[in-house]
A protein has these predicted regions:
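ATP-hydrolysis module of ASCE/P-loop NTPase motor domains
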Residues: 29-112, 295-318
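Short, Lys/Arg-enriched anionic-surface-contact patches
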Residues: 475-498
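P-loop NTPase Walker
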Residues: 1-31, 212, 419
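Conserved helicase motor core of SF1/SF2 NTP-dependent helicases
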Residues: 15-20, 138-139, 143, 150-232, ...
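Conserved helicase/translocase motor-coupling segment
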Residues: 236-363, 367
Length: 538
């Protein structure tokens, strides 16, 4: 906006979809907006949800109501009943639960929306954007340019497409990574003449070739990506360095490695601040989950976690709600246990403030948090989808549209991560596209095979964290963890439980079970306890 003002262009306005909606809806209706949305326990209390005899059912229902509202508000549908919420539920246990309580969930979803509409309670950001779409606004502009179109929701697009102005939508369909926020493939929905902007002045042709090589993996899921990128960037002096991961867990593992092994790194910075990686959107923290793990419920601050009597109850809640953030926290707690406070303390001691970000020796970020940003050199964490994993999953899903979309987004995540660099990249060999020529700007990190000597690898420093709580020392290998635990967040389906039971009865130890199922030892022990295998089979 400042640039337009400096040029004397007073007839140009820069708005987000939400800022437009806010002016048209919130002001005119005198609504009060709830900044952070409603927490699960708040929804349960507001609607007077009942447990119906099933453990924590009121909170599980509230979780699905929250997601159903988000699904509806981001859609272009006029009524809640025009959507089938079950279509976006994939976990078998979650699907069973939602099927059982579907009418109840739908009815209470409509009730919560009605309360917001009448002004009985504060409205959410999703709500006023949805209401903006439903009133079919006529915007008095001659030209409308929609940037970052690949991230648009169906509700945003509906408003955009209905305008009489000359419309332009800009975006990169391969940078669509917000499917979990119900972003749609908007660029393909726009029946406009296409003009390709295929030249990047950020990076060189070698990096462009790497990015295109990743996009070619889409052929595995039968998606054509005939996308040519011309890299016109020039090599620059290395100032900013970043570590980019797919998940919070992958990023935390790498950060621990830097603060415990690479002592020379004194100043680090987390995009979005370190606290955002230790707290879930709902407010639960790693410390809450750790307190539950240690059976010290009196120390738990989050109301939802405090309702859980054990880790098993929390994991059951996670399975029935598909709460990915809580699931990751459980994995971290089971892996690091009481070392977590010292780990977070060590990271925070080296973390610098936002104003001093340029002085950070290393920036840490997930792909979602650094989208739109750039760094001189980057290191990719080994927690993205590999060609081998992609081929395996593609054979399993049998052209299910929902899962194909998720795999497409997994490829996009790696593509977005790679294209954050301006000069060079350090990337695990498992993530390298086949038949790519060598380059001085692309540094391949060797990933050791399981049988190889750990000390012989080029990028597998042993990770040791000492605490005063138990006097023990535990060693971790970041890439080994990712290799072993590649299925850590995959739901425990019935066939997997049967396989686990058989192997347990055959005397296979926990370490080998963890390796076989691609999960942590803590997760295996938890499942053995949940299935009561020790009680049944000794």
């Amino acid at each position: 906006m400042k640039k337009f003002s400096e040029k004397g262009l007073k007839n140009v306005k820069v708005e987000t979809a939400h800022s437009l909606a806010y002016k048209h809806i919130v002001f005119q209706n005198n609504y009060k907006v709830r900044p952070q949305g409603y927490k699960i326990y708040e929804i349960a209390e507001l609607l007077g949800l009942e447990g119906n005899g099933e453990k924590h059912a009121e909170y599980i229902v509230a979780n699905h109501i929250s997601k159903f509202i988000s699904y509806f508000c981001n859609s272009d549908k006029a009524r809640v009943q025009d959507l089938n919420y079950l279509e976006i539920v994939s976990d078998p246990k979650a699907k069973t639960f939602v099927s059982t309580f579907y009418n109840y969930i739908k009815r209470k979803t409509r009730l919560l929306l009605s309360k917001m509409d009448k002004g009985e309670i504060e409205i959410t950001h999703d709500f006023y954007l949805k209401k903006f779409q439903l009133v079919s606004p006529k915007l008095k502009y001659d030209y409308i340019l929609f940037d970052e179109g690949q991230d648009a929701s169906a509700a945003m697009l509906d408003v955009f497409f209905k305008q009489k102005a000359t419309k332009v939508i800009v975006g990169d369909t391969h940078q669509q990574i917000y499917g979990w926020r119900f972003a749609v493939n908007s660029l393909e929905k726009a029946d406009f003449k296409t003009y390709n902007l295929s030249t990047s002045f950020r990076f060189s042709q070698d990096i462009a070739n790497l990015a295109m090589g990743v996009l070619k993996l889409k052929k595995i899921i039968e998606i054509e990506a005939p996308f040519q990128i011309a890299g016109k960037g020039t090599t620059k002096k290395i100032k900013s360095k970043a570590v980019i991961a797919r998940t919070n867990l992958g990023l935390l593992l790498k950060a621990i490695e830097y603060v415990t092994e690479k002592k020379k790194v004194k100043n680090i910075y987390f995009e979005g601040n370190i606290n955002s990686y230790t707290y879930a959107d709902e407010g639960a923290s790693l410390y809450d989950v750790l307190s539950l793990y240690n059976k010290k419920r009196r120390l738990i601050k989050d109301k939802l976690i405090k309702e859980m009597r054990s880790m098993e109850e929390l994991e059951e809640y996670i399975e029935k709600t598909e709460d990915v953030q809580l699931g990751m926290m459980v994995e971290i707690v089971r892996e690091y246990e009481n070392k977590i406070p010292n780990i977070i303390k060590a990271i925070k001691e080296k973390h610098i403030d936002n104003d001093d970000k340029e002085n950070a020796e290393m920036v840490f970020s997930t792909v979602h948090r650094c989208k739109g940003m750039e760094y001189d050199t980057i290191q990719i964490v080994n927690d993205f989808i590999t060609k081998e994993k992609l081929e395996k999953l593609a054979n399993e899903i049998q052209k299910d549209e929902l899962n194909i979309g998720k795999l497409n987004e997994e490829i996009n995540l790696l593509y977005v991560a790679i294209t954050r660099t301006k000069s060079s990249i350090y990337i695990p060999e498992t993530l390298m596209p086949p038949e790519l020529p060598s380059s001085k700007q692309i540094h391949i990190i060797r990933v050791a095979k399981e049988k190889e000597n750990k000390e012989a690898t080029t990028q597998k420093p042993t990770l040791k964290v000492n605490t005063e709580t138990d006097g023990k020392e535990k060693a971790y290998s970041v890439d080994e963890l990712r290799t072993k635990h590649k299925d850590a967040y995959k739901p425990w389906a019935e066939e997997l439980d049967n396989e686990l039971t058989i192997m347990y009865c055959e005397g296979v130890n926990v370490k080998d079970l963890a390796k076989h199922f691609g999960r942590t030892k803590g997760a295996i022990r938890s499942r053995i306890k949940k299935l009561e295998l020790k009680e049944l089979y000794g």
